[in-house]
Amino acid sequence: MGGFSVGMLKDYVDIFVFAVLGVASFLALWFAIERVIFYSKVDLKAYDDIDALNLDLTKNLTILYVIFSNAPYVGLLGTVLGIMVIFYDMGVSGGMDAKTIMVGLSLALKATALGLAVAIPTLIAYNSLLRKSDVLSEKFRIMKK
């Protein structure tokens, strides 16, 4: 079995980055929908303790936070690896024309774009859900006075 090669990196970097970001976007959508459903059905009167309510209200928000915080870095990693492959190809071939380099660079940047495409909607969902959690918590405090 052979060791690491740039050809292997070239073949699998996009697959790896897109798979990680695809799973992250699926999880973000799943947990955001779960929270929306929970918030629409939560019965504040069923809780006696603010701490128990806050535990239930903030469940899965950390996962959304981790996804929006790390998705751009996963995309950036894909871009850096893609650029490394381009530089390697330039070195091996003894030079490339500007058109080939620009095409390679633009293709390498797609990983960063995808990372941002996952992070931005997840950030919006996270902040919206966190605000809803805060509002429900305050409604509980007012109700218990």
From Swiss-Prot:
Main location: membrane
Transmembrane segments: 13-33, 67-87, 101-121
Swiss-Prot/TrEMBL GO biological process terms: protein import; transmembrane transport
Keyword Phosphoprotein among record annotations: no
Bilayer topology term: Multi-pass membrane protein
Pfam families assigned to the protein according to its UniProt record, in alphabetical order: MotA_ExbB
Keywords carried by this UniProt record: Cell inner membrane, Cell membrane, Membrane, Protein transport, Transmembrane, Transmembrane helix, Transport
GO cellular-component term (any): plasma membrane
Subcellular location, record wording: Cell inner membrane
Function, in words: Involved in the TonB-dependent energy-dependent transport of various receptor-bound substrates. Protects ExbD from proteolytic degradation and functionally stabilizes TonB.
Family note: Belongs to the ExbB/TolQ family.
Subunit composition and interactions: The accessory proteins ExbB and ExbD seem to form a complex with TonB.
Name of the protein: Biopolymer transport protein ExbB
